[in-house]
């Protein structure tokens, strides 16, 4: 029976880290790599008798790959501090790890976001498949400054249980994250030689709203669905506004 290490990276997550850690208490090991918290995150982790390693944050890909390399077991469940393992997912993980080896090299897991008081089962946010349970000998994180994901060699299965995601404390926090990630995206795209063609950002944002609100069910999610659709459109527009601004600095 393969043993499982739950691995998390964290930085200033005192309001959410305890729920995340409680949800993975069934794992054989729980490891947190802290990137330099200035709040009570580290104290909360140690109070829960969870293994803690401190390492200055130098990017999501590097930090997560460092974390999985420090795990004591080869089968890794990678979780973020704003996520929790649902009860069904816990049972599924225990089931797939009941044999001699992990049946697949990795497993994709649907992620459900909680936002403005409700589950967002629609828009671009659902189902947000994440490859999070895997054999570290077959996979690792890859990506850029904005997006990172696990890539594995071998067969990949799917689980039905969900990761519960609580990424934003409120709309203001959501807007701050949009500002941060669109800046990172624009800088990466600019270095790669991408251009912001006139009118493209506005058109892409318009179609992003239609896709999220009408075609992917945001309209059925009340005010939260409308807000998510608007925020996703804003994200698209701001990427190209900032890319255009960088082009003007040449």
Per-segment meaning from a language model:
Residues 3-5:
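Cell-envelope/extracellular polymer assembly enzymes that use nucleotide-activated donors
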Residues 7-26:
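Short, well-formed alpha-helical segments that are part of the catalytic scaffolds
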Residues 15-18, 39-48, 88-89:
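Acidic helix N-cap motif at the loop->helix transition within catalytic regions
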Residues 23, 34-44, 80:
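A conserved acidic beta->alpha catalytic loop
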Residues 29, 51, 155-157:
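Conserved beta-strand segments of alpha/beta enzyme cores
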Residues 56-71:
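Glycine-rich, basic loop-to-helix element that forms the pyrophosphate-binding segment
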Residues 68, 74-75, 79, 86-250:
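Catalytic-site signature of metal-activated, phosphate-bearing donor transferases
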């Amino acid at each position: 029976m393969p043993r499982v290490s739950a691995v998390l990276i964290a930085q200033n997550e005192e309001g959410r880290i305890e729920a995340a850690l409680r949800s993975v208490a069934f794992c054989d090991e729980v490891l947190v790599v802290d990137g330099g918290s200035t709040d009570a995150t580290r104290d909360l982790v140690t109070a829960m008798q969870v293994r803690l390693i401190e390492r200055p944050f130098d990017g999501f890909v590097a930090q997560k790959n460092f974390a999985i390399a420090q795990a004591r077991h080869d089968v890794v469940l990678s979780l973020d501090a704003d996520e929790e393992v649902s009860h069904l997912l816990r049972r599924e993980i225990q089931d797939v790890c009941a044999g001699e080896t992990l049946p697949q090299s990795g497993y994709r897991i649907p992620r459900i976001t909680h936002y403005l008081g409700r589950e967002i089962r629609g828009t671009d946010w659902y189902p947000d498949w994440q490859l999070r349970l895997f054999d570290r000998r077959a996979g690792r994180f890859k990506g850029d400054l904005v997006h990172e994901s696990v890539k594995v060699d071998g067969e990949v299965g799917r689980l039905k249980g969900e990761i519960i995601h609580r990424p934003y404390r409120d709309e203001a926090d959501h807007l701050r994250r949009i500002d941060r990630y669109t800046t990172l995206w624009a800088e990466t795209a600019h270095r790669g030689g991408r251009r912001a063609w006139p009118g493209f950002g506005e058109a892409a944002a318009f179609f992003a709203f239609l896709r999220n609100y009408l075609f992917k069910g945001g309209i059925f999610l009340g005010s939260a669905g409308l807000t998510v659709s608007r925020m996703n459109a804003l994200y698209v527009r701001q990427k190209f506004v900032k890319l255009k601004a960088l082009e003007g600095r040449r």
